[in-house]
UniProtKB/Swiss-Prot annotation:
<keyword id="KW-0963">Cytoplasm</keyword>
<dbReference type="Pfam" id="PF17384">
    <property type="entry name" value="DUF150_C"/>
</dbReference>
<dbReference type="InterPro" id="IPR036847">
    <property type="entry name" value="RimP_C_sf"/>
</dbReference>
<comment type="similarity">
    <text>Belongs to the RimP family.</text>
</comment>
<dbReference type="Pfam" id="PF02576">
    <property type="entry name" value="RimP_N"/>
</dbReference>
<dbReference type="GO" id="GO:0005829">
    <property type="term" value="C:cytosol"/>
</dbReference>
<dbReference type="InterPro" id="IPR035956">
    <property type="entry name" value="RimP_N_sf"/>
</dbReference>
<dbReference type="InterPro" id="IPR028989">
    <property type="entry name" value="RimP_N"/>
</dbReference>
<dbReference type="InterPro" id="IPR003728">
    <property type="entry name" value="Ribosome_maturation_RimP"/>
</dbReference>
<dbReference type="GO" id="GO:0006412">
    <property type="term" value="P:translation"/>
</dbReference>
<comment type="function">
    <text>Required for maturation of 30S ribosomal subunits.</text>
</comment>
<dbReference type="GO" id="GO:0000028">
    <property type="term" value="P:ribosomal small subunit assembly"/>
</dbReference>
<dbReference type="InterPro" id="IPR028998">
    <property type="entry name" value="RimP_C"/>
</dbReference>
<keyword id="KW-0690">Ribosome biogenesis</keyword>
<protein>
    <recommendedName>
        <fullName>Ribosome maturation factor RimP</fullName>
    </recommendedName>
</protein>
Amino acid sequence: MGKKVVDITAELVKPILEQLDLELYDVEFKKEGKDWFLRVFIDSETGVDLEDCGKVSERLSEKLDETDPIEQAYFLEVSSPGAERPLKREKDLLRSIGKNVHVTLYEPIDGEKALEGELTEFDGETLTIEIKIKTRKKTVTIPYAKVASARLAVVF
C-alpha cells in the first residue's frame, strides 16, 4: 500500500514542481504511532524556503483531494530534505562535491565502517573523500558499491 501511495503522490506533485522550478527529492508514506504521514521533500539548485513549501502543499493537497488515492486519514508535510539530507542518488552526490559528507559502508575500509570528510570527487564508480586525522589530511577512495548510505554532514 505505501509504495503505491508514494508513486501516485510523485506523479501528482511533479507537474506542480515543474511550474515552480523545483524538483522532487523524495516521498515517504509512513505510520508513526497511530497516525499516517505523507512527506514530500522538495529541492532546487538554490534551495527551498517556507513559501515554496506552502505553495506545493496547497496545490498538492487540492490534487490529492480530487483524486483521493489514500484510504486512511493522514497528515501531509512538504519540506526541504534538511541540512543533513540523505544522498540517495548519484545526482545528489554530484551536487555535494565540495561539501562535507558522512558515509556509512557495508564493509570497513582501513578499519573504518563510517567516514566523514569533504567529498572531493564522484565519478559514478567511486567517491573520493578528504578526511582530517588530527592535524593532517588523508584522501580515501571508496567504491560506490560499498556505500550503504551517505548524507550531508554539518560541521561545527
